[in-house]
Amino acid sequence: MGYTALYRKFRPITFTELVGQEHITRTLRNQIIANRVGHAYLFNGGRGTGKTTSAKVLARAINCLTPNDGEPCNECEICKAAISGALTDIVEMDAASNNSVEDIRSIREEVNFLPTKAKYRVYIIDEVHMLSQGAFNALLKTLEEPPEHVKFILATTEPQKLPATILSRCQRFDFKRI
């Protein structure tokens, strides 16, 4: 049996299971219920506060075939594929190791394609503050005029390293220490 980190094994799969971030989960659920989901989010907070987990839950919730009170059902075809990592419409990128202009340009090309199964293509860019200046400039063009079927969730521990032009195009959520 392979080793699985505890944070992966016991990662919350609904907003309700997320601990200590009710001010954020309530807002996100209300946006989903009202069908008023933004095109770009910035999740900011220290390590282990739930940024990436919230991004994954949000990506599933907005694509879920049978959402319940703003939560993903985690039972439909889309949710199951997303949980297993098989859904190509939810793309996770670690900007610490994929921080070049070329990496972002490939995203810019991909956003023109419609999702294959889900309603939205969701790009989760973790440690976004690690992008190069050129990569930020390339990302900015997509954030300014994103296609209807694309959502971005940027996660960072250091928002002060992000250009003001990126910050101004995202809904910012500050995660509290738990």
Please state what every model-predicted region is.
Residues 1-172, 176-178:
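P-loop/Walker A NTP-binding region and its immediately flanking N-terminal helices
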